[in-house]
Amino acid sequence: MGLFDKHLAYRDAYKAIQDVGANPFKVRFDAVHSPTEGVVDGRPTILLGTNNYLGLTFDEQAIAASVKAVQERGTGTTGSRIANGSFESHVELEQELAKFYGRKHAMVFTTGYQANLGVLSTLVGRGDHLILDADSHASIYDGSRLGHAEVIRFRHNDPEDLAKRLRRLGDAPGERLIVVEGIYSMIGDVAPLKEIAAVKREMGGYLLVDEAHSMGVLGATGRGLAEAAGVEEDVDFIVGTFSKSLGAIGGFCVSDHDDFDVMRVICRPYMFTASLPPAVAASTVTALRRMIEQPELRDRLNRNAKRLYDGLTAMGFLTGPSASPIVAATMPDQERAIAMWNGLLQAGVYLNLALPPATPDSRPLLRASVSAAHTDEQIDAVLKTYGEIGAALGVIEPLKRARA
């Protein structure tokens, strides 16, 4: 019996995927020329699976800030902020985030994953209750495991089921933290946050919204779904990431709670991880300001998302409930999902292949993430390629029948 024997089924499934084409989990970019163009295996490729929603990875001001920071502060911090102190860019980033969200406190983490891991495991523990949307991200589930709170799942995007679960708790002791996402990362659907906030007001507890995929995308100023739904006052904690709209890496949490700052000395994923390199913190501060200065990026992003969503839907692909920057097409079976992904990559379109058990309802899907930087011509080229390969593989007609 070996250490990896428990994973033999995954090993065999992984090998089977690699045996029929490129490895979708180890794609290597020979070059990346822009937010939307790269080279994969020597082929010019449209990038449609990078979560680069506003295209800010190549923003000239963000790049200049990053270069200046690395020249003046070096390549890294070599330790946590607890042990090695904070650089001015860390403090500036937290101040700008607090100002942007209109909150008293902001805390920056080294990754978005660690933000959820740290915040959730610190806020609720044994004897408390963590009420999660069933389709929550892995980082949310992992945070719940680290904190040992009782996990109660409610049906995806179902406020009535949330209320039912809370009623069942009755007068049970312990704090209650409701956790939802702004935009869900697999198929791009949006939480019914106004209704969820109403349940929270009626039944009590705290509400945390993970705005990882909705920051910079939703809301009049880009603050996310809480802003778009008009319920920011009902949201106690907002968690987000810098690796989507802001084109960097890192995570954060903002809150108005007076005691929030104690998190810095009790939150283990914050305390025992090296802090963001100065270059990353500097580029993120600049990208945040650029996002605020350019609301037209959100408009362009939403137009591009609608163009791709409408095109795929019209061809007969089984898309999500509404257009968002994440445009997923559910495939009839895993074999054709893998073949479709390989065909698109060979034709110069890179997007994400998502397979069970990581997908809603255990159905394979192709996941595209649109950018404000995509041109109409690029999206139309993607649609043409999708249609040709989907027809050749017999994907579209079975999906049309399934939709009917």
From Swiss-Prot:
Its cofactor is pyridoxal 5'-phosphate. The keyword Cell cycle does not apply. It comes from the Bacteria. Its EC number is 2.3.1.50. Pathway: Lipid metabolism; sphingolipid metabolism. It is an enzyme of class 2 (transferase). PANTHER family: CLASS II AMINOTRANSFERASE/8-AMINO-7-OXONONANOATE SYNTHASE, LD36009P. This is Serine palmitoyltransferase. It comes from Caulobacter vibrioides (strain NA1000 / CB15N). The gene is spt.
